[in-house]
UniProtKB/Swiss-Prot annotation:
GO terms for molecular function: ATP binding; dTMP kinase activity. SUPFAM superfamilies: P-loop containing nucleoside triphosphate hydrolases. The gene is tmk. This is Thymidylate kinase. Its EC number is 2.7.4.9. It comes from Mesoplasma florum (strain ATCC 33453 / NBRC 100688 / NCTC 11704 / L1). The keyword ATP-binding applies. Phosphorylation of dTMP to form dTDP in both de novo and salvage pathways of dTTP synthesis.
Length: 211
């Protein structure tokens, strides 16, 4: 089973993901957690290339295609092999991030980038995507409290980030069977409980389908 976590930086998705992984492992599920861009050496190098502040002014299509190239490598070398071994794979970001950030905020087209990725990934889609929804103001407050250095996309302005949010919301409407919204404005404990509930329900359906 393949689960992806999406949302603006600062939404708390990574923290919730780590807790869910531990919870599922305590239930004796085999779980691997990964991230995008990244997940293996080549993709991590592409991550550094894209997100480094030296990349300011990068052409939108260059940015989008680098993300997609890293994703294709990640899918074939990490995600699919673990799925074949019976693991639950949870990825911090996947194709919807490129659709939202580059398709929506960079203006390349939400529908166009969504379909392009589906073709490149040969129709491969997550079994479940959780979209952590949070207002721009709350996301910015959380980001400003982080001690680590911000990457190039973290430092984009309000107009860009609002466009990302709108694109994610558009995807939620278009793919309601795959994408579930998590209210990330709640406390970390409430977010974890809601995330856990949605994932456990999906796992039960997945197990029934396998029988």
């Amino acid at each position: 089973m393949f689960i992806t976590i999406e949302g603006m930086d600062g939404s708390g998705k990574t923290t919730a993901l780590q807790r869910v992984k531990q919870y599922l492992e305590d239930l004796n599920y085999k779980v691997v957690m990964t991230r995008e861009p990244g997940g293996l050496p080549l993709s991590e190098k592409i991550r550094e290339l894209i997100l480094n502040k030296d990349g300011v002014g990068m052409e939108p299509w260059t940015e989008a295609l680098l993300f997609i190239a890293a994703r294709k490598e990640h899918l074939e070398k990490v995600i699919k092999p673990y799925l074949k071994k019976g693991y639950i794979v949870i990825s911090d970001r996947f194709m919807d991030s490129t659709t939202a950030y580059q398709g929506g905020a960079r203006g390349l087209g939400v529908d166009y980038l969504n379909e392009l990725q589906k073709n490149i990934l040969e129709g491969f889609l997550p079994d479940l995507t959780l979209y952590f929804e949070l207002s721009f103001e709350d996301a910015e407050k959380r980001l400003s409290a982080r001690p680590e250095e911000k990457n190039r996309l973290d430092e984009e302005g309000r107009k860009f980030k609002e466009a990302v949010k709108l694109a994610f919301e558009e995807l939620v409407v278009k793919e309601p069977n795959r994408i579930t919204v998590i209210d990330a404005s709640k406390s970390p404990e409430e977010v974890f409980e809601e995330t856990k509930k949605v994932i456990l329900e999906k796992i039960e359906l997945w197990k029934k389908e396998k029988r």
